[in-house]
């Protein structure tokens, strides 16, 4: 029983940290600005997984007041990425029957797992639809 407890503790304590590492390194040094928001681009989500269905031509953005091109540090970037990951995990745990929860966690993990490149968005923000929950912005092209 103690062994199972230790395994569970290690899984839930260290797994989010290791899963967030690609987001942390993808976020460093890459910033896009429009008139009202500061966006830190996560890896390009050319293949975005929504409820098990692959959607093409989508982009995911992490928006966090701690992350802007005016003042940022390595630790604030890590904190913002961990918050994004935490939100994705909570969406999985708390909202399995919610359409947005599937989109949220899929977007979070698609950015981390489905792509390895970093690209600046080349589309005007007027052509993008945003869904925002908990400080995390999920941006999908129309």
UniProtKB/Swiss-Prot annotation:
The signal peptide, as residue positions, is: 1-26
GO cellular component annotations of the record: cytoplasm; endoplasmic reticulum
Q: Which domain of life is it from?
A: Eukaryota
- Which key words tag this protein in UniProt? Signal
Instruction: Write down what this protein is called.
Output: Uncharacterized protein C1105.13c
Source species: Schizosaccharomyces pombe (strain 972 / ATCC 24843)
């Amino acid at each position: 029983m103690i062994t199972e407890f230790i395994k569970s503790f290690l899984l839930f304590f260290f797994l989010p940290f290791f899963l967030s590492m690609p987001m942390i390194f993808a976020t460093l040094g890459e910033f896009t600005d429009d008139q009202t928001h500061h966006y830190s681009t996560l890896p390009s989500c050319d293949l975005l997984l929504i409820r098990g269905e692959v959607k093409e031509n989508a982009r995911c953005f992490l928006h966090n007041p701690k992350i802007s091109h005016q003042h940022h540090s390595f630790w604030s970037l890590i904190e913002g990425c961990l918050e994004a990951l935490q939100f994705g995990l909570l969406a999985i745990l708390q909202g399995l029957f919610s359409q947005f929860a599937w989109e949220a966690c899929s977007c979070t993990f698609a950015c981390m797992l489905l792509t390895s490149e970093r690209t600046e968005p080349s589309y005007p923000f007027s052509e993008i639809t945003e869904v925002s929950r908990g400080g995390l912005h999920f941006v999908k092209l129309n």
